[in-house]
Amino acid sequence: MAAISDVDSKKNIIIKGAKLHNLKNIDVIIPRNKLVVVTGLSGSGKSSLAFDTLYAEGQRRYVESLSSYARQFLGKLDKPKVDYIKGIAPAIAIEQKVNSTNPRSTVGTTTEIYDYLKLLYARIGKTVSPISGEEVKKHTVSDVTDHVKSFPEGTKLLLLAPITIKENRDPLKSLQLFSKQGYARIKYQGKVMRIDQVPEDIGRQFDLVVDRIVVKTDEDFYNRLGNAVDNAFFEGKGQCALEDLGQDTITVFSNQFEMDGMKFLEPNVHLFSFNNPYGACPKCEGYGDVIGIDEDLVIPDTSLSIYESAVFPWRGETMSWYKEQLVNSAYKFDFPIHKPWYQLSERQKQLVWDGNDHFIGIHKFFQQLEEKSYKIQNRVMLSRYRGKTKCSVCKGKRLRKEANYVKVGDTSISDLIELPIKKLIPFFDKLQLSEHDTEIANRLLKEIVTRLDFLNKVGLSYLTLNRKSNTLSGGESQRINLATSLGSSLVGSMYILDEPSIGLHPKDTENLIDVLQSLRNLGNTVIVVEHDEDIMKAADEIIDIGPEAGTLGGHVVAHGTFNEILMSTSLTAEYLNGTRSIEVPTARRNSKNYIQIKGARENNLKNIDVTFPLNVLTVITGVSGSGKSTLVRRILYPSILKEVGGYGEKAGQFTKIEGKYGHIKHVEFVDQNPIGRSSRSNPVTYIKAYDDIRSLFASQKLSKIRGYQAKHFSFNVDGGRCEKCKGEGEITVEMQFMADVHLECDVCEGKRFKKDILEVQFEGKNVDDVLNMTIDDAIQHFKNHKQQKIVTKLQPLQDVGLGYVTLGQSSSTLSGGEAQRIKLASFLVKGETKEKALFIFDEPTTGLHFHDIKKLLKSFDELIEKGHSVIVIEHNIELIKCADYLIDLGPEGGENGGFLVAEGTPEEIADRIDSHTAKYLKEKL
């Protein structure tokens, strides 16, 4: 390798002496405008290099170039611990955080597609009257003069303005005013008469003759006519008429935007914005839902028919009268009372809610209860069915009704954003516009179509633009950010992505690789922190950080193309070239216990029956959007939680739950949310090992002499902790106009405790030294000094592959995958209980190297051996091949998903032709 000083910084990004966290003063050269993968064990220092060093420096330099006024909103960025970085480009990081909790944020607004749609509808939308279906137009002065031009020269016309005199005015006085303004005639009851000759008893409605016209062709005539038409529109309050005296025909013009007796709003951008009071539905203010009668509570079981009392409040002696009304009169309007609710058409469902002349609908039923809410039983009844419900005015469309009269290609904007992306693309491809509209819309359509195309490529074709951002999974929101970045087509930037393959089925990974390569081909450097073998194969260069994790990591162990990496001796290379592998179990476990969910039909699930075997490793697979999370998160978890006596969210729509699961006493859903928000929360407090460590320090000789107890070694209560920073180790300085600055506490120097507490040592280490040890080091230290109780509690953290984390590392700095594994470890600590639990994991391999997946599988086996059950949602084939039982949903995502494609052992599924998972599974088996 050439000396680092000789490398050309125009073609490479040069990092010299990176020493942040566990990085061992390393030099790295990253080629510019290439796709580079950074890989290595969890905790080896990949993120420290990619995010905390490269991104931090790219961001910092960009911010430094801004004015001080702009900088105050961006906060101060620390310089990373590195000698220097040359050739760096402006950095964009795309992380896996589900970033939006805003209920107004949707896929359309995040990707900016909705902004372009608003413009499109405002510019070329045609307003259509809901009464006649005709296009609403307003006339201008030139429309009237053009009409006059169509008559032959010499034709006699009258230009009229319709007048209506108000109740409190005298018609004769009003006519005198017109006379003073220079008007001489009116037309009343079909006759033209002079104003000074009108009868005394004239009515309040007549036409004012603004001008008598003899058609000519010269310029002056049309100039005079233009002024006259202006006056006619003014006097007629926006209306005027041309009467052809020869043919006795009248043509009416209006410069108001109206038709069929309705006034319409002229399209503008704000009309289509649900975040603007002008365009938002007045009832729900643009949220799409309101607090009201919750449909799911009123009809909790959609597999029942009206006859079987699907409408829950219409049960019991008093209320069944409402049901009888509908059942007895259904034949009059041909309503199927024996059909299950979920099979009814939208119109039939709406009828039950709205009612008709023969029966009272659900809406009216609750209205009657509200009118008599002074009765206690009515108030109880109402409170039982209250919840978030679709807004009754806009039907969840978020916009005022006038916005939906505007159409492009016969479709309103609300209907458009309800279509999945894969149907939107053909809609715009087939859109036929006039030449004039095409010229206006061309650039907008180009932006819309490219962005839709990117969403399609990153595997999100099943989403609708109206989907709320806060209901997306981590992988989905990351890929939406990726598509948004692509849509803005920046050039010469540095994109740093954190495991974009999360939540992607191997089938979708191929498209993702195309997207990353197209980002590179635009002229950007794309740096990806990734463990996925397919993405590594597609990379131009791979940087492997290792050899192990934590203090044993932080070196560059291999650097080069995929084939060069295969020749090296790093752990990554050994798993890639087959020296090491994750073994396929020789026998699959089977079990007599199971949970069966019948008739699952939430979101896109197609009324399926699914059996989950217990006491084994059950894995749910399927492409993105096939319904895995819906089945497990929305149906299995809340329903089994209720069965074992827990209190959970309301379950999604399904018929019933049955099976042999009496031995399960707890249900744990282990997701990737942080284990604690407070900066004092850390792994060792979470698994309750810190209590033993404090007791150990309190039992030392010096502690006894000074009277210290366990609480003196806690940084959560007063006593031993530093008084100035309250055990935080840092002081937060609030800057009025800038971001808060965190400074190391000058009293304890970041050690959290008072000086005299730190004088207490156990085998040469004080409490601060212990908190700064990695878990691997701490286990060794306590083992050597016979502290088995502490070792037993720390061991599971090492088993799940977190040996590199320090005992006192703040929870807020842990990644989603790490937080999930700490939760897993805390359950392994409790392990040997009589009460058996069901563990549900959502993509536990996030952020895991092959070597770590091996450890994770060992932890799962340990839980199962202790009699617990494990159900996992997963895309990683290495984990899928080790399952005892697979449940494959699909075949595609979105509308074409939600079916049970296959279930059984991996061997049974590998032979299936109709399953996407089978193809990839076969290669591994």
Question: Residue locations for each model-derived region?
Answer:
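Conserved phosphate-binding elements of NTP-dependent enzyme cores
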Residues: 1-925
